[in-house]
Amino acid sequence: KLDRTGADFDFDVQSIIDRLEAKPAVLHIPIGSEADFVGVIDLVEMKSHTWSKDDGSEWDISDIPEDMLDEANSKRQELLDVVAEADDDVLEKYFADEELTVEDIKKAIRKGTLEGMFVPVLAGSAFKNKGVQLLLDAVVDYLPSPLDIEDVTGFKPGDEENELSRSHSDEDPFSALAFKVVSDPHVGKLTYFRVYSGTLNKGDKVTNTTTGKEERLGRILRMHSNSREDIDFICAGDIVAGVGLKNAKTGDTLSDSCLLYTS
């Protein structure tokens, strides 16, 4: 939210250290701030990204401005100091003063992120869609895919000693977690949920493990910001909204059998 009055990127980075006790890996430098925020410098690829339109639909990628080059070089060195330790091969090249490629740096950032060694920090403004494109790229480059995540574990209500697990696979029984419930003026109660395993068709019944009741999923909606799309089928990894789950609440487990998830 660097376009907001009072926005201070350096202060926010320091807050991550002071308040969250986390180690930031700063990937961007903002170009301008508040009303003058126009773009970011990508410290991984050492390029400047500037947005010319208010809706963020068009942007230019160019060399770093001369007046920011020294700062960018200094901040990139700080970034390399943080991320190089995440990968032995990268660390060896770093200590040997060999030039690290973009692929080397991205590899180290991803490995360190997955292992919880540090937290990537990016700059932007979602309201005007500045930097969001780079954020989406970072999600793909650095965050875990379903294959990187361990199986979800849980138990049958009333039998907590018998731990069960579900892999992130379409072949396992259906399981999902309701993480948001809202009232929609057009379709009524909407239950947002993330599918951890299995598949489900529109009209199928699911068991709410909190209430023990079965409910029929009348509609499945894929949400696109301010629009929605009706779909007939979902599988592991999907995040959707369901219509017809009258008793669902935030935090409920939805399953084709009574299974309550703990992690």
Language-model segments: residues:
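Structural and coupling elements of P-loop NTPases
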Residues: K1-S263
